[in-house]
Design a protein with these regions (language model features):
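Short, small-residue-biased leader/transition segments that mark boundaries at the very start
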Residues: 1-2
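H-loop/switch region of ABC-family ATPase nucleotide-binding domains
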Residues: 6-7
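A short, surface-exposed alpha-helical micro-motif characterized by mixed small hydrophobic
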Residues: 12-14
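Short, glycine/charged-rich "phosphate-handling" switch motifs in NTP-dependent
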Residues: 18, 30
Length: 136
């Protein structure tokens, strides 16, 4: 078993069978590589993948960035560290994302994610990552 820590998602795709995506020191998604790349369930993973330049079609000339700033690791709150930057947090009632740390749960076979938002909403949003012509 080999562990590698990197921000180079191209390397991950080539050398790994499984990937753990981390944000603010916590695993937010853990799954086989193809599931993470084509069916991500954690909002941070979706943002990370959206920021990769595409070699297909015409680009806008600008990279897509995750809005906001990373949290201070010195003063993390009690909720999800990604909540202030998350497109799904506003859909979760009672400010749960900001106040309660989500658990890492198995949301599909051998695919774990840490998020309070409705799984179906996240799964629907993740379809934009499926390769053209169908899922891998």
């Amino acid at each position: 078993m080999l562990f590698r820590s990197t921000h180079d998602l191209g390397v991950v795709a080539e050398v790994a069978d499984r990937v753990n995506v981390m944000y603010a020191g916590k695993i937010v998604e853990s799954a086989p590589v193809a599931d993470v790349y084509y069916r991500p369930l954690a909002p941070y993973t979706m943002g990370l993948l959206s920021s990769i330049p595409s070699v297909y079609g015409k680009g806008t000339g600008q990279l897509q960035a995750i809005p906001g700033q990373p949290p201070s690791l010195i003063s993390l709150g009690s909720g999800c560290a990604f909540a202030p930057r998350c497109e799904f947090a506003k859909q979760v009632p009672d400010g749960k994302c900001a106040s309660v740390q989500p658990e890492l749960l198995e949301e599909a076979a051998n695919h774990f994610a840490r998020c309070h938002a409705d799984r179906q909403s996240r799964a629907t949003a993740s379809t934009r990552f499926a390769p053209q012509g169908g899922a891998a």
